Amino acid sequence: MSHLFTGIGAAVTTPFTEDAVDYEQFRNHLTFLKDNQIQSLIVNGTTGEGSTLSTEEKMNLLNVALEVSDGQIPVIAGTGSNNTKASIEASKKAEELGVDGLLVITPYYNKTSQRGLVAHFTTIADAVNIPIILYDVPARTGMTIEPETLQILAEHPNIVGLKDATGDLTHLSRLQAVVNDSFAFYGGNDDLALPFFAQGGHGLISVAANVLPSEYQLMFETVKIDIAKANLIYRELHPVVEVLSIDVNPIPIKVLTSFLGFGQYEVRLPLVPLEEMDQASIIEVFRHLKGESV
C-alpha cells in the first residue's frame, strides 16, 4: 500500500465568529493551503479544536475540505476520542462523506492499558474501509503507544501510519524497528521537523504550515538532496515555531491565521485568546520572517 501522503500536511485551524464556525473563511484558508503546496488537509484535529465542535460542524467542515480538495490532495478527518463507540460512529460518518483517511488519537482520561489500546484501535479499524493514521500525543493523553503495541496494530491492513507527537526521537527509532517500510511515520512536532525527516519520517502534520505551507514543503524536499541547506531553512523557520509555543495550541497559531485574513481571532472555551501584547509579539516574529511582506 502506498503512503496516504508524503511531505507536509496542515493540521488545519477552524475559524469562528463569536458563536459559529466561519465556513467561508475556512474555505478561503484551505484554498490558500492548496495553492501553496500543502500535501494533505487534516480537519477536526487538535489544532482544529475538534473537541469543541459539534458533529454537524465537523461534517460541514469535512464537506468544505472535500470540495476544495476536489480529489487533488488527501483530506484526513480527526475522528478519535476516549469513547470507542463514538469514535467508530464519527469514523463511519467521515468515511461516508468520502474522506481519504482518518486520524485517530489514543484515548485520554480513561487510562487504559496497552492491551486496551490494541482493542480500541483494532475495533475502530475493523469498522471502516479507509486508511487510519494513529495519533500518539502523550502530553495530551497521558499515555504512549509502545513499540510492541505498534507492531501488533501495524498488522491491520487499515492502520497505515502513525503521527508521532511524543517529541522523543529515540522512541521513534524503536517504533521504526518493529514495522516494515510501508508503514508511514508523520511528525507531530514542528520544532523537530528537520531531525524527524532526517530520521526517515515520511512527512509532518504541522501547525505552523497553516501560515507557512510552501516553506515547510521546501524544507521537506530539500532534506532529500542537501541536508545543510535544509538546516538553513529550518533555522529560519524556528523563531516562528518557538513563538507559537507561548501558549497551548491552537491559541497562538490562530493569531496568525487571523492576521492573514482567515477569520476573526476566536477560540472556543475552555481556551481563551492571548493578551494583545502576546498577539503583537507573534505577528512581529512572523512579519520578520516574511520580510515585512505581509
Feature locations, PLM:
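C-terminal alpha-helical cap/extension of soluble enzyme domains
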Residues: 7-15, 32, 36-37, 93, ...
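Alpha-helical structural signal in soluble globular domains
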Residues: 36, 60, 64-69, 93, ...
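Secondary-structure boundary/capping positions in well-ordered alpha/beta enzyme cores
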Residues: 72-73, 131, 160, 182, ...
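Catalytic alpha/beta core domains of metabolic enzymes, predominantly
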Residues: 126, 141-245
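Active-site beta->alpha loop and helix N-cap motifs at the rims of alpha/beta catalytic domains
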Residues: 2-142
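A general structural signal for well-ordered alpha-helical segments in protein cores
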Residues: 5, 26, 58, 62, ...
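Glycine-rich phosphate-binding "P-loop"
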Residues: 136, 158-159, 268-269
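Short secondary-structure transition/capping segments
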Residues: 53-56, 89, 114-117, 145-147, ...
